[in-house]
Amino acid sequence: MRAATPLQTVDRPKDWYKTMFKQIHMVHKPDDDTDMYNTPYTYNAGLYNSPYSAQSHPAAKTQTYRPLSKSHSDNGTDAFKDASSPVPPPHVPPPVPPLRPRDRSSTEKHDWDPPDRKVDTRKFRSEPRSIFEYEPGKSSILQHERPVTKPQAGRRKV
């Protein structure tokens, strides 16, 4: 694996990302007339590469760049197939788990099940009132939820 040039030392970060992507995904094709270990790579797409540039490694050749395919059939050639490699078995779907007890009989109802009919929630909504009608400790919602019981006048604590 090659050492990458730090992004801070590159003038154009977008070009650096492109170059790194091409170096990572480059497919080496051996040529008959060239030596792959001693051939210098050049990148002649209009970018300036001087010997004094910030890159420590030259860019990859664009002629040899080809995205890696996911399967051998995508390449269109049988050169990469190995006859001794085993063929993976076809995909078998996992078995379906048995139905849960609550799924078996939908006619049984429990206390925690949602109600069959919709509940009118308008009575629980508080309508905005004027600030001048505010009474501390008094709530219209509490009056709807439970009736106010007044203490009996006959009993007094001493």
From Swiss-Prot:
<feature type="compositionally biased region" description="Basic and acidic residues">
    <location>
        <begin position="71"/>
        <end position="81"/>
    </location>
</feature>
<dbReference type="GO" id="GO:0030027">
    <property type="term" value="C:lamellipodium"/>
</dbReference>
<keyword id="KW-0165">Cleavage on pair of basic residues</keyword>
<keyword id="KW-0832">Ubl conjugation</keyword>
<comment type="subunit">
    <text>Interacts with ABL1/c-Abl, ABL2/v-Abl/Arg, ACTN, AKT1, CBL, PALLD and PAK1. Interacts with ABL, CBL, DNM1, DNM2, FLOT1, AFDN, PTK2B/PYK2, SAPAP, SPTAN1, SYNJ1, SYNJ2, VCL/vinculin, and WASF. Interacts with PTPN12 and WASF1 via its SH3 domains; this interaction may mediate the partial PTPN12 and WASF1 translocation to focal adhesion sites.</text>
</comment>
<feature type="modified residue" description="Phosphoserine">
    <location>
        <position position="73"/>
    </location>
</feature>
<keyword id="KW-0597">Phosphoprotein</keyword>
<feature type="compositionally biased region" description="Basic and acidic residues">
    <location>
        <begin position="100"/>
        <end position="136"/>
    </location>
</feature>
<dbReference type="GO" id="GO:0016324">
    <property type="term" value="C:apical plasma membrane"/>
</dbReference>
<feature type="compositionally biased region" description="Polar residues">
    <location>
        <begin position="50"/>
        <end position="66"/>
    </location>
</feature>
<feature type="region of interest" description="Disordered">
    <location>
        <begin position="28"/>
        <end position="158"/>
    </location>
</feature>
<keyword id="KW-0027">Amidation</keyword>
<keyword id="KW-0966">Cell projection</keyword>
<comment type="function">
    <text>Adapter protein that plays a role in the assembling of signaling complexes, being a link between ABL kinases and actin cytoskeleton. Can form complex with ABL1 and CBL, thus promoting ubiquitination and degradation of ABL1 or with AKT1 and PAK1, thus mediating AKT1-mediated activation of PAK1. May play a role in the regulation of pancreatic cell adhesion, possibly by acting on WASF1 phosphorylation, enhancing phosphorylation by ABL1, as well as dephosphorylation by PTPN12. Increases water and sodium absorption in the intestine and gall-bladder.</text>
</comment>
<keyword id="KW-0472">Membrane</keyword>
<dbReference type="GO" id="GO:0005925">
    <property type="term" value="C:focal adhesion"/>
</dbReference>
<feature type="domain" description="SoHo">
    <location>
        <begin position="1"/>
        <end position="46"/>
    </location>
</feature>
<feature type="compositionally biased region" description="Pro residues">
    <location>
        <begin position="86"/>
        <end position="99"/>
    </location>
</feature>
<feature type="modified residue" description="Alanine amide">
    <location>
        <position position="153"/>
    </location>
</feature>
<dbReference type="Pfam" id="PF02208">
    <property type="entry name" value="Sorb"/>
</dbReference>
<keyword id="KW-0965">Cell junction</keyword>
<keyword id="KW-1003">Cell membrane</keyword>
<dbReference type="GO" id="GO:0048471">
    <property type="term" value="C:perinuclear region of cytoplasm"/>
</dbReference>
<protein>
    <recommendedName>
        <fullName>Sorbin and SH3 domain-containing protein 2</fullName>
    </recommendedName>
</protein>
<keyword id="KW-0963">Cytoplasm</keyword>
<dbReference type="InterPro" id="IPR003127">
    <property type="entry name" value="SoHo_dom"/>
</dbReference>
